[in-house]
Amino acid sequence: MITIAGAGLAGLACAYELAQRGAAVRIYERATEIGAGSVSRYAGGMLAPWCERESAEEEVITLGGRAIDWWAKVTSVHRRGTLVVAPPRDRAEITRFARRTTQYRRVDGPEIAELEPALAGRFSQALFFDQEAHLDPRRAIRDLAAAVSALGVEICLGTDAPGAVDLDCRGIAAAGQLADLRPVRGEMAILHCPEVKISRTLRLLHPRMPLYLVPRGDGRFMIGGTMIESTSARAITLRSLSELLNAAFTLHPGFAEASVVETGAGLRPAFPDNLPRLHQDGGTLFLNGLYRHGFLLAPAMAQQVANRLRPETQDENHRERQTA
């Protein structure tokens, strides 16, 4: 029996990989509802390795390249790509962004309008990453938990993990046992605006704080992008909320009539290089530091965990990144 502390994104992904390889798995989760204790409930759900490469290391591509197909096995994935835009005064940001990544094509005003008619006449140039995708994080976590349960994994909700477990996936709650793990605050808002029709992730570039908007269906959109070095998990600040709402209005003036149906803030666990790690401490393996790349990198990291805990099933063609 392999025991796991934490039934958030990382813990469930690891349980899925382990159970698929024939392991008996039990997960302990302090929250009484799937996803309630996970910072992933505030995530954008973008499966966007090439966009993330602009501000991250090469590993976001090498580790995140298979995430779309992995998630498509357990939940709905929208393969609509990502459109990166900038207001006229920040047009140089498009060139800067393009220099730091690949797998895009430049599109002009008419092409932007063809991709997203709601943006017609609003932007004259953009980058289109047609291989990227997005998902609904909360639905994805529920679907992953259902898939894990169907494989025979026991999920013990409302239960503290015992003192010794095989795998620790508790995110920022494990900071006391991982010396260089730090919290990075992220904030978001969910808007309801059925008048605006947008079908794919939009990234709005800005020199100080680039933001993203992700469609959730039924006229709902998630907007986020803040990254604040902070230990505070208090509600979203007025400054951050105003910046998010101004960004939505910049994308489309129709958002001026949007209802703000939810706001939230959470603490993402991150190491100094903002990449996830495996760390062995006695009999416990830690997976942590998914930062803002949880849905993108959790599948590959879960495969590494399964290779470590079930070495007899290891795929030798899978390149591991392990840091002890």
Which positions does each model-derived feature cover?
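N-terminal Rossmann-like FAD-binding beta1-loop-alpha1 element of flavoenzymes
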Residues: 2-26
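Dinucleotide-binding Rossmann-like beta1-alpha1 core, especially the glycine-rich loop
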Residues: 44-115
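Short beta-strand to alpha-helix junction loop
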Residues: 55-65, 85-92, 127-143, 235-239, ...
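C-terminal catalytic lobe of FAD-dependent flavoproteins
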Residues: 258-324
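Short hydrophobic core segments
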Residues: 3-5, 28, 162-172, 302
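Active-site substrate-recognition segment that forms the wall
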Residues: 16-17, 47, 76-78, 172-282
